[in-house]
Amino acid sequence: MQQEDDLRGLAKVMEFMRAISIVFVVIHVYWFCYRAFVDAGINIGVVDKILLNFQRTAGLFSNLLVTKVFAVIFLALSCLGTKGVKNQKMTWRKIYTAFLSGLVLFFMNWWMFDLPFSPTVDAAIYTVTLTAGYILLLMSGVWISRMLKHNLMEDVFNTANESFMQETHLMENEYSVNLPTKFVYQGKEWDGWINVVNVFRASIVLGTPGSGKSYAVVNNYIKQMISKGFALYLYDYKFDDLSVIAYNELLKNIDKYRVRPEFYVINFDDPRRSHRCNPINPKFMADISDAYESAYTILLNLNKTWIQKQGDFFVESPIILLAAIIWYLRIYKDGKYCTFPHAIEFLNKPYADIFTILTSYPSLENYLSPFMDAWQGGAQDQLQGQIASAKIPLSRMISPQLYWVMTGDDFTLDLNNPEHPKILCVGNNPDRQNIYSAALGLYNSRIVKLVNKKGQLKSSIIIDELPTIYFRGIDNLIATARSNKVAVCLGFQEFSQLTRDYGEKEAKVIQNTVGNIFSGQVVGETAKSLSERFGKILQQRQSISINRQDTSTSINTQLDSLIPASKIANLSQGTFVGSVADNFGEEIDQKIFHARIIVDNEKVAAETKAYKKIPVINEFKDADGNDIMQQQIERNYSRIKADVLQIIEDEMQRIKTDPDLQHLIPKEDSDRKEE
């Protein structure tokens, strides 16, 4: 009740001030348009005396502006205490227009007294403009009281609530990757840093095509790893985009290594610019489990649907058969013919010869018992189906160029050997991805096993477009390689792509064991998963209730997503969200970031222009300078076929002449021999 009385009292005071303001306007018109009033026969003597006294004592009418200023002051005071009904459609532009128009009409009309009309007409025009100006000023004042003081629609995307302070200090160590950034907090742009101080806890770089993941992140990983003396394995899906960067960075940073590293390339498309390497080098195959790993990797890369069916009979059978052949080539003549092309050619020989030879070795006899049971039991259809499951996919890899690259020994795959460090770039081709990925997957699986050892040089494995290749053991490498100083960086587009090509279980392990994550624009479940990973932040919520008498504002706080999935789905190119892992003694308070990674485009363009091409490794020229590449590759292809034929001939002869092994020869062959 008391409040209502106070409000009524305030309203009366405001009305009184407005009345005073109007009085000033009226006496202003009466004084300065006095001649027009006299001509009209209007003459108020008492008022004249009062106004003359004001003029003598205060000089109230000595200038046109004095009474006008007083009128405006009292008008403003009356408007300050007025509470109008709030209107959401009211805008400052509308208020400013009325206010400025009112000022012009109210104060800038003195010249109307000099118009070439009669005093009465001049006074009428002056009064009309003065009144119009006053009304506009009054309207602007009333409209101000109707304006909402809090416009809740100023930040429609909730950007201010979802901005947060990020790391602004550079934290470097001998292994770190550091990326400069810019981010917005409290309406101001800040310079920041993404400090990956523990690269050995693995990194994932996500983003749809064109989001900038290679340009902003992967390229920087390559440059900074080489500048800090890491051995490097680089899977270059679109060869030679990344390999050229690695080669030129090595040329610039050769002095950062204690032992000068060698640069090697595996490139099936261009044998001139490719080294040769045997991924199943017998030196690094200790037992038959190594052969199984190689067979497993190659066949799952050729048949990615098998990844979801691991353990099935028609998946395991061809893997075991190929593993037996690889191990046989390893133990035959101490691995002289232990190459993958020899294994493919051996597999494509008659299965009667294959099983006769393989089962003549005690170490393989039990390994192949399921096949022998089917053979001896007359289940020829089943046996042929098992063999065809291996033959058909592997036949896609029969290529002279691929045979050439995979049968040489230019280098070994122990990349982080402190005495012989290496930087290896392997190139794929999107047009031949299904074939090359299988061969490259074999290199990958051997490298994972060889680099993950103690006492080796710090090393980095960078895989761009991970789902294009089945990298067996990558989940285990992420989980165990930290103590062996192996830094893993995986680039791909989204989690669902990884799940499709690696299976749900393995994909989940990769997602959940990685310590550092970068994400450009991603959508769907990937964006939701990342949003949950980044957690929630305390955000302010404000609401306004409007009625005729009053406006009430309520403010509350609640936990909400720090970086919502919708924000992640609409990130600009080069803008990334993510989190980093820290170390003991190198703690990072704010591990999460949402920032634009700064790349000096002009500097990068200048560097790229100055880059040297990867040199030709093998000229394939004879003494006269003629190009003999095709002939040399074909000779190698023919030699492998001849080697396998000779192996089978020698082995069958050995078995036939050994009384303890003669029983292995198929009955049909024995009958032919007797004839």
Model-derived segments and spans:
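Conserved ATP-driven motor cores of ASCE-family P-loop NTPases powering translocation/secretion/packaging/pilus
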Residues: I478-T480, N484-A487, G491-A581
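Ordered hydrophobic segments in well-structured contexts
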Residues: S176-N178, C425, T575-S579, I592-H594
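Basic- and hydrophobic-enriched, low-structure N-terminal and domain-boundary segments
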Residues: M1-S211, Y215, N220, K228, ...
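Low-complexity, polar-biased intrinsically disordered regions enriched in Pro/Ser/Thr/Gly
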Residues: F183-E189, N303-F313, R541-Q558, E587
